[in-house]
Amino acid sequence: MAGAKEIRTKIASVKNTQKITKAMEMVATSKMRKTQERMAASRPYSETIRKVISHIAKGSIGYKHPFLTERDIKKVGYLVVSTDRGLCGGLNINLFKATLNEFKTWKDKDVSVELGLVGSKGVSFYQNLGLNVRSQVTGLGDNPEMERIVGAVNEMINAFRNGEVDAVYVAYNRFENTMSQKPVIAQLLPLPKLDDDELDTKGSWDYIYEPNPQVLLDSLLVRYLETQVYQAVVDNLASEQAARMVAMKAATDNAGTLIDELQLVYNKARQASITNELNEIVAGAAAI
């Protein structure tokens, strides 16, 4: 029965692991729902600021803000949003692959890349590659605060303003649904133009803005960029929880399958042991 005892111990170990993965799945599900609510709440604010900026920029014929002006690109900046924790499947790896493909494209054009990193997984990955990292933020937790993110964002904004980079992008995982998270790389600076359909020109926008358009655009553009990166962080967090939920469910299901297989092996071992004992009893009786 030594073999059967070892199998029982292994079954107990797998059951304990299954309890842990099931608990992690349930926690990830709860966190994902809360993050989805936060994500939905912040999106209208960001979209409205974007529309106001576009209308002010269109109405201010005599002033062209540097954040809205295209340049010849010699150096680009990327804000890459990754996770602080693992156990979320291939979420980070898929994002890293997408960014590395972009970096290769820029390198082929003799354009250098500088990074601002959010999330410890991204920090360790890109630093190991020896890439130029301007700023980094880690340990944002499950309730990221704008104040923690602003530093990395402003670092890139100032680099663009001072001509140290000629374009800024943000890379993150967009939450599509529970089963799908898509790596996305979006341009932040110079600010892409909105289509007339997105501007919603049916409404009345004949407003007099105070202070003057230049001061207002300066303030709104910085706030908009901070909001966009915050939105990316929240989106990535929802993707992380969804990916972790799926990964832990798969681990729980696999543990259940392994337990069934081990139980079958245990039953066979026990059956063989009982059969041997019966054979010994019968042989002993025959000898008498």
From Swiss-Prot:
Keywords, sorted A to Z: ATP synthesis, Cell inner membrane, Cell membrane, CF(1), Hydrogen ion transport, Ion transport, Membrane, Transport
Protein name per Swiss-Prot or TrEMBL: ATP synthase gamma chain
Function recorded in the entry: Produces ATP from ADP in the presence of a proton gradient across the membrane. The gamma chain is believed to be important in regulating ATPase activity and the flow of protons through the CF(0) complex.
PROSITE patterns for this protein: ATPASE_GAMMA
Subunit (UniProt): F-type ATPases have 2 components, CF(1) - the catalytic core - and CF(0) - the membrane proton channel. CF(1) has five subunits: alpha(3), beta(3), gamma(1), delta(1), epsilon(1). CF(0) has three main subunits: a, b and c.
Pfam families: ATP-synt
SUPFAM superfamilies (UniProt xref): ATP synthase (F1-ATPase), gamma subunit
Entries under InterPro entries matching the protein: ATP_synth_F1_ATPase_gsu, ATP_synth_F1_gsu, ATP_synth_F1_gsu_CS
Species name: Actinobacillus pleuropneumoniae serotype 5b (strain L20)
GO cellular component: plasma membrane; proton-transporting ATP synthase complex
Membrane topology (UniProt): Peripheral membrane protein
Family assignment from sequence similarity: Belongs to the ATPase gamma chain family.
One function term, GO molecular function aspect: ATP binding
GO biological process: proton motive force-driven plasma membrane ATP synthesis
PANTHER family assigned: ATP SYNTHASE GAMMA CHAIN (PTHR11693), ATP SYNTHASE SUBUNIT GAMMA, MITOCHONDRIAL (PTHR11693:SF22)
Localization terms from the record: Cell inner membrane
